[in-house]
Swiss-Prot record:
Binds 1 Fe(3+) ion per subunit. Belongs to the rubredoxin family. This is Probable rubredoxin. The keyword DNA damage does not apply. CDD domains: rubredoxin. PROSITE patterns: RUBREDOXIN, RUBREDOXIN_LIKE. The keyword Lipid metabolism does not apply.
Length: 63
């Protein structure tokens, strides 16, 4: 269990360049039915920012 938590913590967060929303893989995103532990890279290309609707390509990595 500790190994899984450290893997999730190592995943990068991404910020929407349109509205500033931050996707945190450790938390996931309930509004889009994205479970905790889902890396940004694994989100489908059709995934949109839950705050403003921007496309996935409008996000930039943090950290």
């Amino acid at each position: 269990m500790a190994a899984i938590k450290s893997e999730v913590s190592a995943m990068k967060r991404y910020k929407c360049r349109v509205c500033g929303y931050i996707y945190d893989p450790e938390k996931g995103e309930p509004r889009t039915d994205t479970p905790p532990g889902t890396p940004f890279e694994d989100l489908p290309e059709t995934w949109r920012c839950p705050s403003c609707g921007a496309k996935k390509k409008m996000f930039k990595p943090l950290d």
